[in-house]
Amino acid sequence: MTQPVMSKPFVILVAALAIPAPALAQADSAKADLIPQLVARLDLERYKATIKGLTRFGDRRQGTDRNRAAVDWIEAQLRSYGCSDVSRLKYDYQPSPPSPEGRGGQGVRTRDTSRASGGGRYRGIRARTGVNTDSLKQPDARLRALDTPPSVAGEREEVYCTKIGTTHADEMYIVGGHMDGIGWGEAANDDGSGTALVMELARVFSAPDVHTDRSIRFVLWNNEESGLNGSRAYVEQRRALQGSKEEPKWLGMIQHDMMLFDHGMPRADGTLAAVQRPEADVNIEFQSSSKFAAEAQQLAWVFHAANEKYATDYPASVGSHMTNTDSAPFQDFVPAISLRENERGTQIGAGWDPNWHQPSDLYATYNDADFRLGLNAAQTTLAALAGLVGATIR
């Protein structure tokens, strides 16, 4: 099958990142100074405050009043930043009926248990993972009451806004995180951390003195935890509209999902280190089996290079096993990557994050070293995007 041709700005940026340092030094100094200025507009306390704001709505489970209130709050925040074209995507969600095998109508499914979701191979110590469904495991009575109303099938909404480009408004990058959660906690990390990151990027890029050649759409997905339903609905409803005024051509999709916790592999007894490991990093993933694997891999390395130049604390690594997040519905239509605290399949899926889908996924669980890992992911994405869309300050 013929591979798609990469967009011109993408090719130019990849080439630019390969130019030796002496040649880069001859570049226009104003543009060379631009990205550090934008990165400096990200702030740890602002990022933390946005995560904290999201946790006011508990786990934000899809199909609940608390989820709808969170969508309203996110929209109000985006409008306060001055982000353009604030809109909502509407879709209907009807969960599959339970099957006798307990797989929501999917029946019995077998797979190689030595291989992780996404294609990686488990290594080292593995700890048990799962979704907490027991309300009594949440000791905070206030939060337990907030998270009690169940999900109801029906119409869903997710909010997005767009930074409209000045010269190529008909082309855009999609930047996402999912705002819904599960587990009887506050969904602070999964995925308050990614949602807050995307909102902070929207704030920085929406400043009146920031201009971009190409557009950026910031999307806060709903229904990720039920099967990527919100992002699937977006692809189904809007893929064919590309090139129109309301849906610029997709140049790439960048997802952010669980950004805070990289304390290392579980110990033999299943416990983990209490503090962020010194060698913590931002995982940048693409899917090697996708139709746009080559382009997605190159996009991932663009983000890796941006991290090397502009992130303040933690490095990045690139992997080929992107899975189980809202970039997946896009991966066969456009270069798609995701940024995470750890590789989703082989590490998070092996118990590297004990708060994943648990009552302990609370704002209070994390400290500044954890929040700073999320901020470094924000710095990475902001720096890479600024180059990809031709950002300027004037």
Predicted feature locations:
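Alpha-helical metal-binding/catalytic segments enriched in His/Glu/Asp
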Residues: 159-161, 175-228, 381
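His/Asp/Glu-rich mid-to-C-terminal helical/loop segments that flank catalytic regions of hydrolases
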Residues: 345-394
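N-terminal capping segment at the start of a domain
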Residues: 27-65, 81, 89, 94-102, ...
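A non-catalytic alpha/beta surface segment that caps or lines the substrate-entry region
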Residues: 49-162
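Second-shell loop/turn segments in exported
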Residues: 33-42, 55-66, 145-150, 180-192, ...
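Metal-dependent peptidase/peptidase-like ectodomains
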Residues: 221-326, 332-336, 343
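N-terminal signal peptide c-region/cleavage motif recognized by signal peptidases
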Residues: 20-22
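Structural recognition of the beta-strand scaffold that forms the well-ordered cores
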Residues: 47-55, 85-89, 158-162, 172-176, ...
